[in-house]
Amino acid sequence: MNLMDGLTFEQQASRNFLLQRCTFQRHPIQEERKKERILYVSLLNRLVRSQLDPDPELTACLQRLLQVLDVSAEEMKAEETAIPKGLKKLASVFWHGGFSFGLKNYQALCLVESVCLVGLAAHDSKEKMQAVLADFCKTGKIAETLQQSLTDYFNHLFTVTVMTPGKELAASASYLDFMYGRLFRYRELPRYHVAICATMSAGKSTFINSLLGSDYIPSGNEACTAKITSIADNDIFPELLGCCREKEVLHPPVTPVTNEVLQTWNMNEDIAHVFLEGDLQGVGSEQTVLVVHDTPGTNSSENPLHHQRTMDFLKHHPLQTIIYLLNAEHISTSDNKTLLLEIKHNVLDVVPQTHIVFLVNKVDSFDLESGDDLTQTLDDACQDLEKLGFKEPQVIPVMAYAARLFKMALMGQENRFTRKEKLEFADFFERCLEENLDLTKYQCHIDLPGQAPTASGSVIIGKHTYDKGKIAEALRCTGICSVADLLDEAVHHYQPEDKPLSPAEVLQQQKDGALSEEEKELLADLDQWEQENVDEPLSEEQEMADLLADLDQWEENNS
């Protein structure tokens, strides 16, 4: 599938996910006679197709509706009732059940559902959809009073409002709200973008999986692939969907996205970007969509492509926060210095409102009993960052691997533990609770003790029984809850701009502004000459010609 005009690949993926989530379950006309079902889907198909070019995702979406209504493609195509006449028939569908009988109105439902599908497939705004509705009403010769009622109903689909639908939609309103209202409200939510950056072997994949509560990033991802993985939170539709971009082609959505699918995408070097959408555990907001972007782990000496892909993404994608992971075992490296300086120069200095927070991972490698000084190590890290130009850097130490094991136990996934992981779980649990290793006490320029998740009950791991409440407290001690709280607070207080800009867009705006000022100066000189020489002899026209030539040359050089 090629990129739609005006949409980024990320927007196109989100649009495809919305169409994929159109399951048409609980459709009101599903219980009617087959001839009414055929008429309904035929009219809907013709209305939708009248507005859109052929699209494989839309075709797949309409195919699901045929399956739900138990109508074949041949039966749909054979229905040739004219649209005005067909809509009139749908306004008075006879039904009977037992000793009851009467008429049902599906005319309004067909019109609204057609416009909703067009709006999702074309990524239309509410205003554009209302214009499409007006066009459909004109085609179907619908009365103006009904058209106004349907237009008013669209406001309800986009915003959470209390309203009483007109009698034409009374029986269908709950389906429309369940099917489309949730989709459009999710689509309209602002997005808070977080990029995760690190050099090789910082434990970035483990950190992302422990933060989000599932194995979204295959183990060893940073060492073998130069791709971006973007994961969007969707609390309304928790089922995980995914698709990938191979070169300049966006592939259709896949569901369910299994670990095997992720591994296949990860090992394919032609895939440049993976898009995922599902319910992220422990982070997020109902008012804003959190999107986490995993960038390739960089190592400029081994694979410069990883570094290039990371910087290209950071420069050309609007970001609200960057989380930078440092390996506690190797904090001061040339690769770290190179990447951090580029991030500062190309992102933070260009878009100062972008927030950056530093995590020192793999702190569990420290042997405090043998004299390893965690406090001094973190102080040194802060000083090194300040020398690179990061004023009062916020530094949070974390044990991402321990956090991943604790989260798995809390989520009932302890049966997936290997023998080695069971032993490591016991060791981490002992260090956090019995030896009082609380990493939240070692934070620099930030104070986030972290909120332990609520948990009850117990779990058996190996030969030991663990209280889940204590596991939750051990999870808090790893520092991962502090990171989650940091993101939650940022997301909840996020006030989006009209259109957040990437560093590249900001630079282009600055360049355009500078050029326009220079052009204004040239035009001002020209205006002044005209005022001073309006009554001068014709010989002065040569100076005028020279000024015009200068202006033409400038426009040619800067076009």
Segments from the language model and where they lie:
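N-terminal low-complexity/disordered regulatory or targeting extensions
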Residues: 2-201, 214-281, 346, 371, ...
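Globular "head" domains of long coiled-coil molecular machines
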Residues: 7-15, 177-437, 457, 468, ...
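P-loop NTP-binding site
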Residues: 410-559
